[in-house]
Amino acid sequence: MKNMLNIILTLTIIFIGLIKISISSDSGSSENGIYFYTYDTICEFTNSIRDDDQYELYYVQAPLMYAIYGDLFEKINAYHSGVGFYNLNGGPNISIDYFAGPTLEDALIPQNITKDSQGNYNLTWNTYGLIEVTNYINETYWSKRELIMYGLTGLQVKQYLSWAPIYNQTHPVYNLFSIASADASGSGDNGYLETILHNLGIGGGGGGSGSENLIVYQNSSTCDDFVWASFNTIYQLGGTLVGMQSNPPKDQITLFTTDEPTIVDYNNITQRNQLASFYINLMGIANKNESALQIFQELISLFNGTFYCYIDGVYYELHLSKPTPISFTYQPSPMPTGQRNSNSIETLNNCYSKSSTDNQSFFNRFSKIQIIFISIAIGFGVVIILYISIGIMVNKSRGKSGTNLIPNKKLWTSIGSKFKRDNNKNNYKPLLYNENTIQ
């Protein structure tokens, strides 16, 4: 019941209509050196990454709707999440996340509901899910960070970023809810998270207690789902998981239904008008001159009956479970395990080059210690050249010629004689030990 109250409280604030903003990850612009790349421009960014740079991967989180409410939603474990790559070689760090556009509210209710001349309704939506990459990690915004993997190369990061557009193309709409069956006990709350992740190919096995009775009809498509898909992708590409005492926590909102959701025929005027009535009531809750408590109570009743979900252009009718119609959890979630298969990761063709270091400056190819030794060697060579050049000019002014122009000729000759081979001596032969030579 506590989980249900948490999610209803979250939705109460959403439907009051106070969040007409995007929940994208960072704030910044190209003017201060911060650049934003979406799925269709990521390839412009990948070739700025050096193949041999070393990275660590972090799970980063920010309180939901931080720009308006600060850390308020942190109190109920409601977070926006992403992935952060920290460059260990001094290059730019990288953050990437998946968010609802234009706003989170637009993923829940239609943009417009209009009525035609015959009194029939039409619903239009403006919602999408968008991946955003930034060459910067805003540590004020991403207030929670947890190390997940290490030993990543720049090449693996580029391969991952080339996978991200494929993910966005297959997840074009932000879907807040998973839809699952209620289990045999009617609670619908046991093992569903493990089952969902297992269906996505993440985690070592099936669900926990009760999952054998659970059917997942529809997976969500949220920021956390993108993060866990990212963990799996990086793992398949060769990332090394750190030793964690427990798996990182994941937000999950699930609607539990008593039977399989049915697709609503939008072309059926009767069914379309029922859809419109549902969403009009939903939006009307926020427009009523009522207290937050009254809105809260109306939303509770809303989640105890017939419910409609709009997912990627399709409407679904759900009959929600009475004991537990909805669940909002924030709990440890399985990480990828088992044998890796980098060939299972689909990437965008021609999105990155494996030889980007050819386009880097000379010194960017070496570590700091190597640069120090190279600098010393170059400096020593310059000193020798100057010494010989000045010495030749001085000796020439003294009337010397030929090899006598070389400064300190006797010194250089004696050094050279140390390495001169004596042709009168036998060549070195290794001493072979046998019974006669060993006394």
From Swiss-Prot:
Compartments where located: Membrane
Glycosylation: residue positions: 93, 112, 122, 138, 168, 219, 268, 289, 304, 359
Alphabetic keyword roster: Glycoprotein, Membrane, Signal, Transmembrane, Transmembrane helix
Any Pfam family hit: CLN5
Signal peptide location: 1-24
Chief place of localization: membrane
Homology family: Belongs to the CLN5 family.
PANTHER family recorded: CEROID-LIPOFUSCINOSIS, NEURONAL 5 (PTHR15380), CLN5-LIKE PROTEIN 1-RELATED (PTHR15380:SF1)
Protein's name according to its UniProt entry: Cln5-like protein 3
Organism per entry: Dictyostelium discoideum
Gene coding for it: cln5lc
